[in-house]
Every structure is written in structure tokens, then in C-alpha cells.
Amino acid sequence: MVFYKVTLSRSLIGVPHTTKSIVKSLGLGKRGSIVYKKVNPAIAGSLAKVKELVKVEVTEHELTPSQQRELRKSNPGFIVEKRTID
């Protein structure tokens, strides 16, 4: 199944109420929030109305919030093998 990965990239400050309601109906809240929506014409129409505010990618699978968090974590560059107690 194919999904749209929708990221809110611009703030909603100063945006008309109708545009805000479209963004809220997509499930986006704060700037940088991410939602996955199944590809269908209704969602595509909503995304076209707010195309200046969102970033859209097409993905094959949906990621859970915990999986998204794991992808954002950086490699610390070391591994703790043994802890010493003082």
C-alpha cells in the first residue's frame, strides 16, 4: 500500500481560517509534525490546497512514532561495554 508522508513545514500564523481547518483535518498540529495518509483523491485535493505549507513524500510503508524517533537518533560513536561503580 502507498502512503503520503505529510510534514507541516510552515507555521499557521496569519493563515486564513479555512486553510487552518484543512491542515487540522489532515491531522497536523505544530510545525514539523508528520502524519501518514493513504493515497486517495480526497487527500490529494486537500494537500493541493495547502501545498505551500506542507512537504509531501510518497512512501511504501507507514512508520509509527517510535520508529520515527529511532530514525532521528544519531549514532553516539561509542558503546558502553562495562559500567564501573565508584
Curated annotation (Swiss-Prot):
Any GO BP annotation: mitochondrial translation
Region (Disordered) location: 67-86
Coiled coil: none
Predominant subcellular localization, coarse grouping: mitochondrion
Location of the protein in the cell: Mitochondrion
Domain of life: Eukaryota
GO CC aspect terms: mitochondrial inner membrane; mitochondrial large ribosomal subunit; mitochondrion
Gene3D superfamilies: Ribosomal protein L30, ferredoxin-like fold domain
Keywords: Mitochondrion, Ribonucleoprotein, Ribosomal protein
PANTHER family found in the cross-reference section: LARGE RIBOSOMAL SUBUNIT PROTEIN UL30M (PTHR15892:SF2), MITOCHONDRIAL RIBOSOMAL PROTEIN L30 (PTHR15892)
Protein function: Component of the mitochondrial ribosome (mitoribosome), a dedicated translation machinery responsible for the synthesis of mitochondrial genome-encoded proteins, including at least some of the essential transmembrane subunits of the mitochondrial respiratory chain. The mitoribosomes are attached to the mitochondrial inner membrane and translation products are cotranslationally integrated into the membrane.
Family recorded in the similarity comment: Belongs to the universal ribosomal protein uL30 family.
Protein name (database record): Large ribosomal subunit protein uL30m
Record organism: Saccharomyces cerevisiae (strain ATCC 204508 / S288c)
The gene coding this protein: MRPL33
